């Protein structure tokens, strides 16, 4: 049963990350004709296409993709808790799972971008999209801390900021008195 839970949880998280990538790519105005962008659109289009006719976009945010990502996070919470209930704690857990997945996605994009910058040297279409994704997040840090000696420290600063936010959210959840949510947050 734990193997099935792990497998289902992983598949849900991966598809949620692809949905979040789609939202992020639209927000960052990534090159739509890039092969990686086309992959993300083709993987998500069967579910998002019909929903977009019913659910309009909220400015630069693709609300249909965000809704499906939240529903998948809610399903992941049910899978992790191994209980089918619609109590508010499960809805909150779904939101926390979605927020944690956003943080993990940012971390992985930064890590893969850094590794690819050492290996591919700008020839990969994936690297081009990752740079387009990370640039809006790194630009404010680069304004405060420009590259020193040709080394850009902004990705490391952003990863450190993600860790601080992660610990801060855990402390806030612990202060609520509910022991389930901080444990869930740290276990994800």
Swiss-Prot record:
Stored InterPro entries: CCB3/YggT (IPR003425)
Stretches that traverse the bilayer: 1-21, 67-87, 89-109, 145-165, 168-188
Protein topology in the membrane: Multi-pass membrane protein
Entry GO CC: plasma membrane
Protein name (database record): Uncharacterized protein YggT
Localization: Cell membrane
GO terms, biological process: cellular hyperosmotic response
PANTHER family given in the database record: PROTEIN COFACTOR ASSEMBLY OF COMPLEX C SUBUNIT B CCB3, CHLOROPLASTIC-RELATED, YLMG HOMOLOG PROTEIN 2, CHLOROPLASTIC
The organism of origin for this protein: Escherichia coli (strain K12)
Family membership: Belongs to the YggT family.
Keywords (A to Z) from UniProt: Cell membrane, Membrane, Transmembrane, Transmembrane helix
